[in-house]
Amino acid sequence: LMNDDYFQAWINRLSARYCDVVSYNLYPLGFERFKPNGLPDVPVLITESTVGHGTRGTFGSITNPGVEPGARNRALARQLESAFSHPQIVGIHHFKFTDQVLTGRWDGENYGFGLVDITDTPDRDFLETNRAASEQLYSFRSGAGVFLNLP
C-alpha cells in the first residue's frame, strides 16, 4: 500500500482477512496515534520508515528533525520507543542504507536518511542509537527495562 488508500477501512479489513501481518510504509516520528481505520487487532510491520538529517549535504527534508547536534538520534529514539510501545507493531524497518545522491534518484528524490552517506561514511552516532535500541527491544517490550536515555 503506497497511496492515499492506506487507511481506507475496506482495504484494511480485506488485508487483515488474508494476511498474517499487515505492512505499511510510514514516516512519523511517533506512532501513538497509529490506528488504521477498520484494521482489527492484527500484527503490523512498518516496512519502510526513517529519520532524516539536515547536516550532511542533501536537500530532501522527509522526517528531518533539525540540524542541531543529536537531533536525529533523539528523533530516532522517540520513533523507535513509540513503535516498540504500540501493541500492534511487531517490527520497524529502516529505509535506507545509504543517503541518496545530491542529484537525486530517477524521480529526483534526494533525501539524507541513510545509515551511511554517499561515500559510505557511517553516521556512527545514528548507528549506535540503532544498535542500542535493538539490544534493548525485548526487555523494553516485555516491560522489564527502560528505553534509551539520550541527551
Question: Residue spans of the language-model regions?
Answer:
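Glycoside hydrolase catalytic-domain groove-lining segments
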Residues: 2-63, 77, 81
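Alpha-helical structural signal in soluble globular domains
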Residues: 13, 18, 82, 86, ...
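A short acidic, glycine-rich active-site loop
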Residues: 64-71
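Long, C-terminal catalytic modules of enzymes
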Residues: 69, 77-111
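Aromatic-rich peripheral "rim/lid" segments of glycoside hydrolase catalytic domains that contact
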Residues: 95-151
